């Protein structure tokens, strides 16, 4: 759907009405469109009694075709103990970026990293940047703790499991937090995510605003 009817302004597969042509997006389309995977997906969607979508993007793609059996249930997260947050803001922001091997361009962490490096160069005394690559989820979470903010999910309207885990530990998320996501949650007040558009300029602007207003 993201490659044909394109209900999203941007996604892993499109910018507006244009298909993304990066290697990962092209590979994903070849893997799904016109293949046994697609046929199985269509069969399951047609014959099942209900479709549970965990992200706005999934809901947006399934609901128009299956309006009576598509239900949105947000991804769950184990909150655990209340995070310990220092009473005073830090003098230097500890920013964490986790990079998945071979999916950096697809997920936009390449752009987020360039933006973070730019802000680090402009405000070296205000930003401490920690970058990790290819960590298993448990190790990712352990390494992320102690950070003040993370950058993740550039092409998403919503937070995935990594940003949700971060926020459960009191860590600021810079990434996907579009109004449509909050509307589906019926949330009219809280906006915990620093939303960025899928561009280098938007990431630089948002991070600069954060580090200069600690």
Labelled PLM ranges:
Residues 145-158, 171:
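Acidic donor-binding loop of glycosyltransferase active sites
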Residues 172-179:
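Short hydrophobic beta-strand element within catalytic cores of glycosyltransferases
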Residues 41-53, 58-77:
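Helix-loop-beta element that forms the nucleotide-linked donor phosphate-binding surface
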Residues 141, 163-168, 182-183, 187:
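Short alpha-helical segment that forms part of, or immediately flanks, the ligand-binding pocket
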Residues 16-51:
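Membrane-proximal helix-turn-helix segments that form the acceptor-binding/catalytic region
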Residues 132-143, 155-159, 163-164:
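Conserved active-site histidine-acidic residue motif and adjacent donor-binding/catalytic loop
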Residues 73-107, 113:
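Conserved donor-binding/catalytic core segment of Leloir-type glycosyltransferases
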């Amino acid at each position: 759907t993201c490659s044909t009817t394109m209900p999203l302004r941007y996604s892993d597969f499109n910018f507006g009405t244009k298909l993304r042509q990066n290697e990962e997006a092209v590979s994903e389309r070849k893997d799904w469109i016109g293949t046994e995977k697609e046929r199985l997906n269509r069969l399951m969607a047609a014959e099942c009694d209900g479709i549970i979508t965990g992200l706005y993007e999934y809901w947006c793609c399934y609901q128009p075709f299956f309006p009576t059996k598509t239900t949105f249930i947000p991804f769950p997260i184990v909150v655990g103990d209340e995070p310990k947050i220092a009473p005073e803001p830090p003098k230097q922001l500890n920013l964490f970026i986790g990079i998945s091997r071979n999916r950096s361009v697809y997920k936009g962490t390449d752009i987020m990293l360039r933006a973070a490096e730019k802000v680090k160069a402009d405000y070296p005394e205000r930003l401490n940047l920690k970058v990790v690559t290819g960590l298993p989820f448990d190790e990712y979470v352990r390494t992320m703790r102690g950070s003040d903010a993370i950058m993740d999910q550039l092409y998403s309207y919503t937070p995935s499991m990594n940003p949700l885990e971060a926020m459960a530990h009191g860590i600021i998320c810079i990434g996907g937090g579009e109004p449509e996501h909050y509307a589906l949650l019926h949330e009219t007040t809280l906006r915990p995510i620093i939303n960025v558009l899928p561009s280098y300029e938007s990431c630089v602007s948002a991070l600069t605003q954060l580090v200069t207003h600690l």
